[in-house]
Design a protein with these regions (language model features):
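Extended, non-catalytic interaction/assembly segments in eukaryotic proteins
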Residues: 1-216
């Protein structure tokens, strides 16, 4: 088994590329920082790179991808990403999941039928010093990226819909299935969260109406 793994590793791209010692110096500094900090801004990351000899922006970007792949730093940044996540480098993944679960598990929010207001975000996350106000948009952006919520149209960024928290009320609908095109998907095991994520992904179609069978 060891020999087979070694053989396959030899086929991987960049496996034999030399890695500058300065990259490991930055990696060690970030590991030390992670003991006391949940995240680092892009400006802080760039300063740390500069201090350890990684001065070119292109090299800093390559190193950040390297650290992301290793799991030392998680960065979901993309200049074209509408969620604007590139300025926050995650040193402690639990910080993100903890913030998300604070929102999803809030007792008052469970009564709103899935509607999350900006004031709710400030109330829930603002009670914990680990989530300063300037990082609230990042937590929301991560929820949008992973299809946990989306902006309610015409709410000017002040209201969001969290499908996972929709009330389980069913409506009575008289639908003539004989006159429509029907698709049926069968799962041996229905993955958790697939219907809420489906709602997020198809949100632009909900504006003109939609109906999903209750037996899914």
């Amino acid at each position: 088994m060891r020999a087979a793994i070694s053989e396959q590793l030899g086929y991987m791209r960049h496996i034999h590329d030399p890695v500058p010692e300065s990259y490991f110096a930055v990696k060690r500094q970030l590991e030390l920082r992670a003991a006391e900090n949940d995240f680092a801004t892009q400006e802080e990351y760039a300063a740390l790179c500069e201090a350890n000899g990684v001065t070119e922006p292109g090299d800093q970007a390559i190193l950040l991808r390297f650290l992301h792949d290793l799991g030392n730093v998680l960065n979901y940044g993309d200049p074209d990403d509408p969620h604007k996540l590139q300025d926050t480098n995650i040193l402690n993944p639990e910080w993100v999941t903890g913030g998300v679960y604070k929102l999803l598990n809030d007792r008052d929010l469970l009564q709103t039928g899935g509607v999350l207001e900006r004031a709710d975000v400030q109330r829930i996350l603002g009670a914990d010093p680990r989530y300063p106000p300037e990082r609230h948009d990042f937590i929301l952006g991560m929820m949008k990226k992973f299809e946990l919520c989306f902006d309610i149209p015409d709410a000017l960024g002040q209201s969001y819909l969290v499908p996972e928290l929709l009330l389980p009320n069913e409506i009575s609908l008289d639908w003539d299935f004989a006159q429509t095109l029907n698709f049926q998907y069968d799962y041996n095991v229905l993955p958790d969260g697939i219907l809420p994520r489906f709602i997020v992904r198809m949100r632009t179609r909900w504006a003109t109406g939609g109906n999903a069978g209750a037996r899914a």
